[in-house]
Amino acid sequence: MNKKLIEVALPLDAINDASAYDKMPGIGPHPKGIHQWWARLPLPCARAVLFASLVDDPSSDPAFADKTEKEQEQERDRLFRIIRNLSQKKATQSPEVFDAAHAEILRSCGGKLPKVLDPFCGGGSIPLEAQQIGRAHV
C-alpha cells in the first residue's frame, strides 16, 4: 500500500499561518478569539490535510520507484507548493489552484475520485473542502 503525503511530511508553517488568519481574518489576536467553537476546523487546514491524505508520497509512488532520492524530494517540494497554494488566505479566488489539486488527486487515485467520509462532521469543513479541492464524492 502506498504511503500518503500526510504520513511523511507537511509544510506546517504555511498551514499554520493560513489557519490562524482564517480564525481571525484581518484583526489578528482579538478577544473574540478567546473562545472558538470546538469543532471548527479552519478551512485552509482542512484543504491541506485532505489533499495530503489523498495524494501519494513520491517515496512510495510507483511512478517514482526508479528515481533518485533527490528527484523524489523535488516532487515532494512540488506537492508542498500545491499545499501552500491551497492554504493561501485567498485560495478560493484562484480556480487554477483547485484544478492542480484535482489533477494530482486523480493521478494518485488511479483516475477515480475517492469517497471522503467525515462521520463526525462538526462544522462541515471537511465535506466542504473535499468537494472543493477534488470534487470528491462525500
Locate predicted features.
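Short charge-dense sequence patches
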Residues: 1-2, 100
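N-terminal-proximal low-complexity accessory segments that begin disordered
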Residues: 2-41, 45-48, 58
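Short secondary-structure transition/capping motifs
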Residues: 35-39, 68, 115
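Class I S-adenosyl-L-methionine-dependent methyltransferase module
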Residues: 39, 58-59, 132-137
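Active-site nucleophile-adjacent alpha helix/oxyanion-hole segment immediately C-terminal to the catalytic cysteine
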Residues: 49-53
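Short, glycine/acidic-rich hinge or "gate" loops at secondary-structure transitions
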Residues: 59-70
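Conserved S-adenosyl-L-methionine
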Residues: 72-74, 78, 88-137
